[in-house]
Regions:
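Hydrophobic core of alpha-helical transmembrane segments in multi-pass integral membrane proteins
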Residues: 13-26, 142-146, 182-186
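N-terminal TM1-TM2 helical hairpin plus the immediately adjacent luminal interfacial "cap"
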Residues: 15-90, 96-99, 104-113, 164-171
Length: 198
């Protein structure tokens, strides 16, 4: 097995591990969901863990399964582009970008749950890396991602997405997540460029 295949394999296993944790949280039902979700009023009251935990609980099993399938697909598509420590950094920057966007640009958003914003960030970071390495398919992925974001900002959630997830879709999460992930990808690209021999 070559290095790239090993990295893809490891990324898929990491995605499954994340999904196992997310599924365990879902087993807790509504009480766990309400305790962990991004909740503006509760965060204002000092429950700052919600800034992180809210991205790992879901509206229900259909929402979780939809995001789980997305996570596995993204792990397969871009998992080999970064080491696991870099993916952790990408996740932190993506979540930070989303939380800053929610807090300062979406004050009307009282609560939020779900992985979808983080998924957009992971895909964006991997896509930046793919484009940097001149992999043509990532230009296509970038165009698709940009088109999806533009559609959502102009017209709202994609048709059928709210029905399949079991609730309202916060399209701002996709935008902020993408921006956070793209920033992380660019930072890694700049770091590699500065470290390259002249």
């Amino acid at each position: 097995m070559d290095t790239r295949k090993k990295a893809e394999f490891a990324a898929c296993w990491a995605a499954l591990a994340v999904l196992a944790v997310v599924a365990a949280l879902e087993l807790g039902g509504q009480p766990v969901r309400e305790w962990l979700r991004y909740d503006r009023a509760a965060i204002s009251g000092g429950e700052t863990w919600r800034l992180f935990s809210g991205h790992f609980v879901h509206l229900g099993w259909s929402h979780l399964l939809l995001n789980g399938a997305g996570l596995l697909l993204i792990a397969y598509l871009v998992g080999a582009h970064f080491a696991w420590r870099q993916w952790v950094a990408v996740s932190i920057l993506t979540i930070a970008g989303m939380d800053l966007g929610f807090w300062y640009l979406q004050p009307q958003l009282s609560w939020y749950v779900g992985l979808s914003g983080l998924l957009h960030g992971l895909l964006a970071a991997g896509t930046v890396s793919g484009i940097r390495h001149r992999q043509v398919e990532f230009s296509i992925i970038a165009a698709f991602l940009l088109g999806k974001l533009v559609y959502e900002q102009l017209f709202g959630p994609l048709p059928g997405s709210e029905a399949s997830s079991g609730g309202n879709v916060v399209v701002a999460a996709h935008l902020y997540g993408t921006l956070g992930g793209a920033l992380a990808g660019l930072l890694f690209a700049l770091r590699k460029s500065s470290a390259a021999p002249i």
